[in-house]
Amino acid sequence: MIDLVNANLLNSLARRLVREGLLDEYQALTAQKDAQQQKLPFIHYLSSTGRINSDLLAYLVAEEFGLPYLDLDTFDTRYLPKKAVDEQLLRKHQALPLYKRGNVLSLALSTPTNLAAIDEIQFQTGLTIHPIIVAEEKLHQMLETSLETDIAALGDLESIELEALQL
């Protein structure tokens, strides 16, 4: 059980992790303090330590913030909206557009408090952003794979154009 002094020091996610038995109070307080000292979002810090399964963490984050959760293992990358968002913004904010419907862009994020990502991407695209919470390590893998595929496709296109010019 969380004592009243420490309960006031823990953020809502940390309290939830203690209630779920995934961390004790001391671990939660220490993790919060370490994340602040390293200037990392609490969720990123927890993911990087490996103390909590990243899928479970993402699910609890989504529940705690009232946002949808998606297991990226179940997502078909063929349907990713290509070129919906500038590659530099995606890398900067570790965000991945999942699908676009009308003027709404569903965006995979591991940290729902990353308001800068939502604001910048919304400004750049002119679309309403619908955040979807995903596991951080899976997001990173899918983002890199997706961007590498785009770069490889551009390389193929350039070689085809050069061959056509040589003919």
Q: Where are the regions a protein language model picked out?
A:
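N-terminal, intrinsically disordered, highly charged
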Residues: 1-167
